[in-house]
C-alpha cells in the first residue's frame, strides 16, 4: 500500500515527457509478457495486472493534466 502512495506521488511530479516514456516502456513490457505467455515461458502471471494498472494510472494522470490545461 505504501508503494502505491509513492507511485502516485511520483506520477504527479513527473513531467509529461517522462510519463510518455514510462508509458511506452510499460507497453513494451506488456507486449513481451504476452509473447512469453504465448510461448509458455511466463511464470509470474500476476505481472499482467500490475503492468496494466500502471498503464492505466499513467493514462489517467496524462488525462488530468490535459483537462487542466484546457480550462
Curated annotation (Swiss-Prot):
Keywords: Ribonucleoprotein, Ribosomal protein. Transmembrane segments: none annotated. One of its GO terms (cellular component) is cytosolic large ribosomal subunit. The keyword Ribonucleoprotein applies. The keyword Ribonucleoprotein applies. One of its GO terms (molecular function) is structural constituent of ribosome. GO terms for biological process: translation. Belongs to the universal ribosomal protein uL29 family. This is Large ribosomal subunit protein uL29. It comes from Rickettsia akari (strain Hartford).
